[in-house]
């Protein structure tokens, strides 16, 4: 029996060593909010209220705290692109976000702000500024296009699209979004159908944070079956902590399968 197991290991190793490699892994962040999102908080231990109240001068001190070269505050805040960035506070906030992404070696980022695409170009420019002024970093993140839509049924739909589709996405948002804070008056099923028709990847964000899988949820059984049908749902995302990773994942899969 031992000889048989060794034979299996030998064959497995041979197949593994001879297998052609078709790609490589890249550190990716597929759900990122930027300072244009109404509930943005900059740091995980902050609140959105704290971020709204903090001043550009305080952010300047944080940004340059550990830097060897410190740019004069007046010069720093007078040189940003006022067409792209709405204020000096927004400008330095995006620089801080871009630097954090680069420092953490994240190569691909999908911007998914709440009900708006305004943060994409701002983050792209912020990344370019950091890379130009701080050449110590060797990773230039690719910023991809996305949006997180707050649906009328209280679900959030993340959509990831190509640059060429941005005009269609922005037109849809202008016609179907009440406000960036309130979201859309359309239900998630309508949103998913619209974006599927444009061949735009979409999915329910952090769907295990809702009660939709439980009996007595605000959505009917027929509606849920339609949402999770093959033609509407191809992907789904979860909020998982290390503590409950395995149990939550198994629970969610069982609920979908059974």
Curated annotation (Swiss-Prot):
SUPFAM superfamilies: PHP domain-like. Disruption phenotype: Strains with a pezT/SP_1052/SP_1053 disruption have partially attenuated virulence, they take longer to develop a terminal infection in mice, although they grow normally in liquid culture. A double SP_1052/SP_1053 disruption grows almost as well as wild-type, showing the effect is mostly due to disruption of pezT. Induction: In S.pneumoniae strain 0100993 is found in the pezT/SP_1052/SP_1053 operon. InterPro entries: Pol/histidinol_Pase-like. This is Uncharacterized protein SP_1052. It comes from Streptococcus pneumoniae serotype 4 (strain ATCC BAA-334 / TIGR4).
């Amino acid at each position: 029996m031992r000889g048989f197991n060794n034979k299996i290991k030998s064959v497995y190793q041979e197949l593994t060593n001879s297998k052609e490699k078709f790609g490589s892994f890249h550190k990716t962040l597929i759900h990122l909010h930027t300072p244009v999102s109404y509930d943005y908080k900059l740091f995980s231990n902050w609140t959105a209220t704290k971020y709204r109240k903090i001043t550009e001068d305080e952010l300047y001190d944080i940004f340059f705290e550990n830097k060897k070269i410190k740019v004069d505050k007046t010069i720093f805040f007078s040189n940003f692109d006022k067409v792209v960035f709405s204020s000096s506070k927004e400008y330095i906030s995006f620089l801080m976000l871009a630097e954090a992404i680069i420092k953490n070696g994240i190569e691909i980022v999908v911007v998914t702000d709440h009900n708006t695409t305004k943060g994409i170009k701002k983050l792209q420019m912020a990344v370019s500024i950091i890379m130009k002024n701080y050449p110590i970093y060797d990773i230039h993140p690719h910023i991809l296009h996305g949006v997180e839509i707050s649906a009328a049924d209280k679900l959030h739909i993340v959509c990831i699209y190509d640059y060429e589709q941005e005009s269609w996405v922005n037109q849809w948002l202008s016609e179907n979004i009440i406000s960036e804070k309130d979201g859309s008056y359309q239900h998630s099923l309508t949103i998913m159908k619209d974006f599927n028709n444009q061949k735009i990847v979409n999915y329910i964000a952090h769907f295990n944070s809702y009660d939709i899988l439980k009996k007595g949820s605000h959505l009917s059984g027929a509606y849920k079956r339609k949402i999770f049908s093959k033609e509407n749902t191809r992907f789904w995302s979860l909020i998982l902590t290390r503590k409950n990773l395995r149990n939550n994942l198994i629970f969610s899969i069982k609920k979908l399968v059974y």
